[in-house]
Amino acid sequence: MPLFLLSLPTPPSASGHERRQRPEAKTSGSEKKYLRAMQANRSQLHSPPGTGSSEDASTPQCVHTRLTGEGSCPHSGDVHIQINSIPKECAENASSRNIRSGVHSCAHGCVHSRLRGHSHSEARLTDDTAAESGDHGSSSFSEFRYLFKWLQKSLPYILILSVKLVMQHITGISLGIGLLTTFMYANKSIVNQVFLRERSSKIQCAWLLVFLAGSSVLLYYTFHSQSLYYSLIFLNPTLDHLSFWEVFWIVGITDFILKFFFMGLKCLILLVPSFIMPFKSKGYWYMLLEELCQYYRTFVPIPVWFRYLISYGEFGNVTRWSLGILLALLYLILKLLEFFGHLRTFRQVLRIFFTQPSYGVAASKRQCSDVDDICSICQAEFQKPILLICQHIFCEECMTLWFNREKTCPLCRTVISDHINKWKDGATSSHLQIY
């Protein structure tokens, strides 16, 4: 119970001679004030009423109060009064605080224990996962090591089989390498001659034409017994039985021969003088020929593959024959879908070929003088200057070459054309159409 200490001034002592001689009225007045102050302090200590009976002596409180009298006291002391009383509400508050603190400490301890348990479980799960991943990685590494050892032991046998396969198909492999080399050489030469424009060599173009024609004739003459040229007009070569490698052989040779044929047509266009056919018109012809070549090459392999798929069921029962028919029909459906997918592009190419859209209007001399009569692309004087919609001026030939691969202005990147004339530079697609 809390201990209250009241520090009160002591009454004047009557021990001195001088104090006895003070007036009685003055002494009695100071004592009355002293008594009134004590009563006021006691009334404050015991308020509110009705709570003094429930005091608890186990929790002392101390209050130190000092009251100073109104009268002049030359010698005054402090009186300490201990009051062992506390209201019931204070005791209840203290007990409730103790209970709450105990509950809080208990809950806090439970939460901490749960968190520690959860952290320990997570740590164990992490360790287990790491161990499993380590085991999986080690097992994968061991399997890869076993596979490598098996390949290392089997390498001599693989080399023997590879040499045997090469010897069996040495003719086809050698011919394929020769055709690919011929195509790459001719394609690069044609692109260079188209780029040179008026400086192109007519002799070089004539040589390319003769070289491509001679290669095609020599190839068909060498294998005339197989009648490989039949596949150029959607007929089957004269072969008794078509295997997979024979189909691959026929389709591959036919695809290269078609490329050589259209490349020869491009060489003929190169030989045409520029006053008969301008360079701008030649570019559109190159583009049209390449698109025709690609679409024709798409349909040429159809008869050969269709015969191969149908022949799958000729020497078997009804189930195998039905399966062959189903595979052939699926092949035809896929080819038709491919054709209709490219039909939009082909229509766009035809529209460009017949309209030959212009990229701008002819620039005036004043407009050319404003830019010092120098083309920003070729760094030379303007030749047939063209004013674009972005107000930049370039040579017509420079613009034609630029828009063969780009859609925007070389300086400000404003979109000028809605399409790219991919094949106007005379190039031929290197894609091998084998299906």
From Swiss-Prot:
Its membrane topology: Multi-pass membrane protein
Catalytic activity: S-ubiquitinyl-[E2 ubiquitin-conjugating enzyme]-L-cysteine + [acceptor protein]-L-lysine = [E2 ubiquitin-conjugating enzyme]-L-cysteine + N(6)-ubiquitinyl-[acceptor protein]-L-lysine
Keyword Transmembrane among UniProt keywords: yes
Region named Disordered: 1-62
Pfam families tied to this protein: zf-RING_2
Enzyme class label: transferase
Keywords associated with the record: Endoplasmic reticulum, Membrane, Metal-binding, Transferase, Transmembrane, Transmembrane helix, Ubl conjugation pathway, Zinc, Zinc-finger
Biased composition (Basic and acidic residues): 16-34
Pathway the protein acts in: Protein modification; protein ubiquitination
A cellular component term, taken from the record's GO annotations: endoplasmic reticulum membrane
Record flagged with keyword rRNA-binding: no
Biased amino acid composition, Polar residues: 40-62
UniProt tissue specificity: Expressed at highest levels in testis, lower levels in heart, liver, lung, and kidney. Not detected in brain, ovary, and uterus. Down-regulated in testis from patients with maturation arrest (MA) or Sertoli cell-only syndrome (SCOS). Ubiquitously expressed with high expression in testis.
Gene Ontology molecular functions: ubiquitin binding; ubiquitin protein ligase activity; zinc ion binding
Name this protein carries in UniProt: E3 ubiquitin-protein ligase RNFT1
